[in-house]
């Protein structure tokens, strides 16, 4: 009996996870699309049976406009999360389907990675996981919420082969 290779995207399709990926950024040094799939799925797989997420990479000016228009902050940020079914479910509750949008600004991510002594891949992974957790209802406004979210980020980053994103060298 001939064995066939197992490809991650096939597993993702069976789990009904759809990531609509768009790179509208001019930045170089961005990880492959499949990496973003893998990182987002790692956060989702234990809590959602199905998900439909758009992940868009935008240059600083567009990311700044979204941050200004939706959060009232006039600067480009690393990641923005827009949960389309926000408030319908609780974190850690298995749901039928999650819908949401992630916007990542590669220029900000690359600058932060250099400043923090991280690899670009590590920082993109962290922010993809971080943003996906926000879509799932996690937050870090209150200290107790931040502890829960950061613990989950650390666990997922370690599972992906990366160090604790909050540990300084």
UniProtKB/Swiss-Prot annotation:
Record keywords: Cytoplasm, Endonuclease, Hydrolase, Metal-binding, Nuclease, Ribosome biogenesis, rRNA processing, Zinc
Domain of life, per lineage: Bacteria
Xref: SUPFAM superfamilies: Metalloproteases ('zincins'), catalytic domain
GO annotation, biological process: rRNA processing
Any one GO molecular function term: zinc ion binding
One GO term describing the cellular component: cytoplasm
Co-factor requirement: Zn(2+)
Main localization, broad class: cytoplasm
Residue sites binding Zn(2+) per the record: 130, 134, 140
CC cofactor note: Binds 1 zinc ion.
Keyword Cytoplasm: yes
Function, in words: Single strand-specific metallo-endoribonuclease involved in late-stage 70S ribosome quality control and in maturation of the 3' terminus of the 16S rRNA.
Family statement: Belongs to the endoribonuclease YbeY family.
HAMAP family xref list: Endoribonucl_YbeY
Protein name: Endoribonuclease YbeY
Organism: Neisseria meningitidis serogroup B (strain ATCC BAA-335 / MC58)
Organismal lineage: Bacteria, Pseudomonadati, Pseudomonadota, Betaproteobacteria, Neisseriales
